[in-house]
């Protein structure tokens, strides 16, 4: 089978390349070359203490690592990002590093007011930790189910949670509290994006609500495609119906 192109799959908060296991198998079976880089300090055993340097790792550090990775390829790939990975894909697209970008339930860039009661509750376990923006943080099980994993069958929630690692408190602050970040690390120059972009929201998402994805699409401006998956939460990478959603998503893209 001839290779149709290269997809760089960018995982989200607390995750790793395993997030894309199902998507990669599906897309590779249809001729795509799928690459799954792991964000800095995320290639870790969830049972081990996190690297303390993770706590102050910036979105800009993640983006710089991914930029170096992509520049080592033969040409600009399609970027497929989930959650924070969707925001990183947007940042990279604005740097001219994407042939196209698909953003699944993406985190929002600076300038988008996305805080809702559900978002605040989703991050509450992080926000209550003293100086959370300087330490590695991880959601508790109940918080993760509320924010991310609620659309999974009950029997899959704990095994999925047990694979989650710590995340950078700084990166979380740069997204959720962008208005307090003097560097605006989550800033995206929408005018610099020269490739097709598809944004996908989920109707029942609490972590990156459909309302926030719509605001992000409006912020980016005309020319970007927006779709919404019904009856689905944040974990679009593995919840029931993921195969049908991805197949439909690829046809629309």
Residue ranges and their predicted role:
Residues 206-212:
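Conserved alpha/beta-hydrolase "acid-adjacent" motif
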Residues 118-162, 171:
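Helix-rich cap/lid subdomain of alpha/beta-hydrolase
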Residues 27-50:
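Conserved alpha/beta-hydrolase
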Residues 223-253:
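Catalytic active-site module of serine/aspartate enzymes centered on a nucleophile-bearing elbow/loop
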Residues 80-85, 89:
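Gly/Ala-rich beta-loop-alpha elbow adjacent to hydrolase catalytic centers
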Residues 97-134, 171-180:
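Flexible "cap/lid" loop of the alpha/beta hydrolase fold
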Residues 12-15, 83, 203:
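Active-site glycine-rich loops that stabilize anionic/oxyanionic intermediates
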Residues 193, 199-201, 205:
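Short beta-strand/loop motif that positions the catalytic acidic residue
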